[in-house]
Amino acid sequence: MRNITSFFKTFLLWELLKGMKVTGKHFFTRKVTVQYPDEKTPISNRFRGLHALRRYENGEERCIACKLCEVVCPALAITINSTEREDGSRRTSSYEIDLFKCIFCGYCEESCPVDSIVETNILEYHFEERGENIMTKAKLLAIGDKYEAQIAADRLQDKDFR
């Protein structure tokens, strides 16, 4: 009896028919593919995208040059140089992030004591020239100024988890 069932399963391609049954069952269901440039899926407020530097309400940059983000970065993508002011406080003279090295882990954002460096939910960006992958302090501050309302809203929504 065992040989007969084995014979029918082999010559009738039983495994192939079982696979085709699964394919046929899912053939008429709703598709889950998104046509990316035209359609976009919703992005979480915790998404880790392009970096930005924030300012205080009075316009002064938040970064105090503590260099915690530079130390905690596992990819060594952040470089900070600082200068001391007349009042004794430190501020950054240069702040650079190499986006080719960055792995977007979010450690820089978590380690910042003054909430200066943040990762926005900017997903789409490109480079046309060599060297544009280095995000300078001016570029990071410009991104922060442009998207401050969105960054603040995401922070407010996520405050219970920080």
From Swiss-Prot:
Annotated Gene Ontology cellular component terms: plasma membrane
Annotated SUPFAM superfamilies: 4Fe-4S ferredoxins
Lineage top rank: taxon: Bacteria
Membrane topology value: Peripheral membrane protein
UniProt cross-references to InterPro entries, sorted A to Z: 4Fe4S_Fe-S-bd, 4Fe4S_Fe_S_CS, NADH_quinone_OxRdtase_chainI
Disulfide bonds: none
Keywords for the protein's UniProt record, in alphabetical order: 4Fe-4S, Cell inner membrane, Cell membrane, Iron, Iron-sulfur, Membrane, Metal-binding, NAD, Quinone, Repeat, Translocase, Ubiquinone
Positions bound to [4Fe-4S] cluster 1: C63, C66, C69, C112
Subcellular location: Cell inner membrane
GO molecular function term, any single one: quinone binding
EC number, UniProt record: 7.1.1.-
Cofactor remark from the record: Binds 2 [4Fe-4S] clusters per subunit.
Residues annotated to bind [4Fe-4S] cluster 2: C73, C102, C105, C108
Function field: NDH-1 shuttles electrons from NADH, via FMN and iron-sulfur (Fe-S) centers, to quinones in the respiratory chain. The immediate electron acceptor for the enzyme in this species is believed to be ubiquinone. Couples the redox reaction to proton translocation (for every two electrons transferred, four hydrogen ions are translocated across the cytoplasmic membrane), and thus conserves the redox energy in a proton gradient.
Family: Belongs to the complex I 23 kDa subunit family.
Record-given protein name: NADH-quinone oxidoreductase subunit I
Organism annotation: Francisella philomiragia subsp. philomiragia (strain ATCC 25017 / CCUG 19701 / FSC 153 / O#319-036)
Lineage: Bacteria, Pseudomonadati, Pseudomonadota, Gammaproteobacteria, Thiotrichales
